[in-house]
Amino acid sequence: MMKKKLVLVCTIFALIASFCFSQTKIPEDADFWSDYPAEELADFLVGKMSNDELLSQILMFGWAGAEPSELLIKWVYERGLGSVKVFGWNTDNTQLVASSVATLQKKSQSRKLRIPLFVATDQEGGWIRHVKGETSETPGNMAIGASGYPIDAYYSSYYISREIKALGINMNFAPTVDNYTNLQSSVIGPRSFGSNPDFVGQLGASFSAGSIAAGVIPTAKHFPGHGDTSLDSHGNLPQIDIDYKTLENRELVPFKFLIAEKIPAIMSGHLSFPKIISNGEPASLSKVFLTDILRNRLGYEGLIITDDMMMNGATMYAGSLSRAFRLAIEAGNDIVISSTTARWNESLWTSNLALMESSTAFKQTVQKAARRVILYKLNYFKSNNAAPLYPDPATLDQKIPDREGQKFFLSQACRSITAYKTGKCLPFAPDENERILLAGQTQFPDFFEEAKKRYSNCAEFKFDYEMGPNQADWMSRNIQTTAKNYDTIIICVANERSAMIAEHLKNLGKKVVIMSVLSPVPVLNCKWADTILLGYSYSPYTFEALFGALNGEFEADGELPLN
């Protein structure tokens, strides 16, 4: 009996000691980089933060020019802005991007708690490439869908991420896992992996894994799914008229794949589902979508980030940026993006800071979001694979473009090329007297250059990528007249306007080869052409692959990833 009592007493003392020592005492002068368990350090940091700092931590701002404005820099070092976004208008000079990131991170480290910035961009690959300069122009998601290999998704993301990581960018708003359901979707199109939800989910999960391996945080978008609308949420609030069962079995499927793989971030979309929520509120501002569905039903525990709140899809419903911000936080977002210059965000700041001071519930919601952001920052920045806080512009030539990546992107482009119609021009072996007309967009010089590497007897007919109806009509009549003097016409089709020009070659009795780039939808009914090749992007690798396939250098084995 005495022995049992002694064991019981020892057990009780052990439990008490375990409880006491499990609560780490963090000194008052600790900061973000102090060596303590992440969960406890996150609690400590949030407890030390003022309302100003808490609110700032859940904001992500962009800047208007090539370099951050003095006002944005002040937001970082005076208020503790938590995140910044690199947009396409900031990025023609990658060295300037790197130095801008370093400047902003240095300001973040001058504050007492030394919490670094999340630095994000949209580098999806293919059509969407916000960081330009010397970065790789890649085949893109639909090309990955056409090749069908998850390993292509993995390495596409891996090499894209290595390039932007060299610039100090630590978060990428990719992959896009919207199903290409509505074939008239102008905003998604080739950004999608395809129409099959399971397929999209598998490729999205592989893309995410490649990003993580390279040291960049991936972000799946646009929850709960942007693929079944022809409207663009930049200018409108799209309404998607499906019920919850359809949503669950189609739109949500790719997100389920990614949640199972512990995707660290998901972007909420400005999309209305009136059959699910009758008041028309966008998913990005909806507690039903973000808390009830994403958090509770799907079990997602990572960061939720809004799409840009300056898009009409958000502000049209909320009525003002300030109210949209409040609704976004109350719905369950952790980071709110506003792309405008910092001065436009002052009203957002003032009204929501006042609300924090008057509403305990709202303050607690902000605290919860700020804690989640800080916890993810602790786990990311203290890993051995984080992007540099202070990227060195002098070393970028060695890293951008990624040399290994260039080889991969060409091979991946070749795997993606789809012979939608083979015809008598595949392979194309013209005799020395054959007259060839190359018809393509002025903005795609690689189309003409790759053709002339293989076929010397070529003439050029150029038109603009973007044309009004009158210009397209004039070009259509002009190409009919010009094409009569040639035996074969090879035309690049990138949109409905260029497809209209191609249609005017239909009854001339000439051999016509259509090379489709971006979405293949405009050429799907052009069966009158002799040969149709699908390439899915206008990258130089894609044009090299398209002409390689046409020339018989390899077989075009890609498959159209649309239902």
List where the protein language model places each region:
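Second-shell residues forming the walls of enzyme active-site clefts
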Residues: 50, 93-113, 127-129, 195-365, ...
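Bacterial N-terminal signal peptides
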Residues: 9-18
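A substrate-binding/cap region within the structured catalytic cores of diverse enzymes
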Residues: 144-169, 176-192, 196-197, 204, ...
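Structural recognition of the beta-strand scaffold that forms the well-ordered cores
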Residues: 57-62, 82-88, 116-121, 125-127, ...
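Short acidic, glycine-rich surface-loop motifs adjacent to enzyme active sites
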Residues: 75-94, 173, 183-184, 258-280, ...
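Bacterial N-terminal signal peptides that target proteins for export
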Residues: 1-9
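Preference for extracellular/luminal or secreted protein segments
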Residues: 22-74, 78, 318-563
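Active-site mouth loops of central-metabolism enzymes
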Residues: 58-68, 141-154, 236-250, 312-319
